[in-house]
Amino acid sequence: MTAALTAAWRDPRALAVHAEEVLAGLPHKADRTPGQRARLDAATDDARRGRTAFLAEHGQAVYDALTGNRTRYLWLDELLDAAAELLDGLVPTREQMAAEAGRAQADKEGREIDQAVFFSGVLRHERAGLHLMESLLRPTDRALALLPEFTERGSVDLGRLHVERVGDAAHLTVTNPDALNAEDNDLIAAMDVGVDLALLDDRVKVGVLRGGEMTHPRHRGRRVFSAGVNLRHLDAGRISYTDFLLRRELGYLSKLQRGLLPVDASGDPVTSRKAHWSTPTVQKPWIAAVDSFAIGGGMQLLFAFDRVIAASDAYLSLPAAQEGIIPGVANLRLPRIAGSRLARQVILSGRRIHATEPEARLICDTVVDAADPAALDTAVAAAVEELAAPAVLANRRMLGLAEEPPSVLRAYLAEFALHQGLRLYAPDVLAKTTKFSGTS
């Protein structure tokens, strides 16, 4: 199989090699002439066209070679390393990506687009794509290491996230106070661990996510749910395609909806917390408590929750058109939840939805009086008691299968993986990140 893949890769590899040769002969990105940029763009487009065609025909075989015919689960970075070793030039090497690190987004060569071509090519093949999605449902190594401490003490500090067990609930509190709880690489990693701990702890029946109090001057002392992606980090080149944009959707957001697959890379159980024989994943209901606002990725999160409770002075928005990137899986989920017209107003035109508007009831189950400091806590406690009922799990599982079968999500993610990578380096996005770089 490897010999056949190597032979099939020969011509696309030649295009990739040519693109690297063109790049090697050019000055720093900022010093290139229009003609030099056009020559590099043409060579790079040819190489990406070759990779895309190769993966369309051989993506399943490539993935099978990397995973032992789907007998091993690999994390995203492991899959990239294995692909770089299997077929030279198919994806950027670790060394090539290290050379990009530390550069501002506008100064990078866009090698993450080549990663996007690869992951999109894998996800387009049903067996490979579904197996990759399963791989990211596994518990993180950090969560497994922290599980004994969390089980015993009932709390753990993950830096950007604090997790505490209170009664039947695991309360996940986002703690990025100087950036309005904006999402960055560290928060995505912490969320993955926090969701794992909630799903692995037998004493937890319900998960709750809420934003902590701010130190930001404009909102000091107030709780904020989320300001979305950290735009300063995006401008600085510190928002990773794999560790943020893909891991977020395939990792903890998928775990919120589809549950945790408690196995290791070989498919063996990793803890005594095994899924029931009737289902491979450990699922629990989730509650989102929204203070102040849920912007961008914050609003996206709400579509994965079983209960959304908002303060009456809160608002929701998805400024995708303004920021220039794709709002995760929102384009798949919001039309189903709120209807096509409202989804287009929110995603394409940046419409804000205030918690007191009638349309907010399509997204928020309960709106409580913001003037009552205990109202949101009381509503969360009541929701925890309600969702801890034994029959909730079976019914939420069936709702999930009816609303968003894995095959539907896979098809969406195959397109998202590619086009989000392209948007990350689109000229309009690069221009906007500089504008937003002074904001939180």
Placement of each model-derived feature along the sequence:
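Long, compositionally biased, glycine/small-hydrophobic-enriched stretches that function as flexible linkers
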Residues: 1-142, 155-156, 262
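C-terminal long alpha-helix characteristic of the crotonase
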Residues: 4-50, 310, 314, 364-411
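Conserved CoA-thioester-binding segment of acyl-CoA-metabolizing enzymes
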Residues: 6-11, 117-219, 237
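Glycine-rich beta-to-alpha active-site loop
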Residues: 44, 48, 59, 73-108, ...
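Hydrophobic/aromatic residues within transmembrane alpha-helices
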Residues: 172, 209, 230, 301-302, ...
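A structural preference for short, pocket-lining loop segments at secondary-structure junctions
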Residues: 172-173, 190-268, 281-282, 287, ...
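Crotonase-fold acyl-CoA enzyme core
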Residues: 271-390
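Short alpha-helical scaffolding segments that buttress acidic/His motifs in well-ordered protein cores
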Residues: 346-347, 395-399, 437
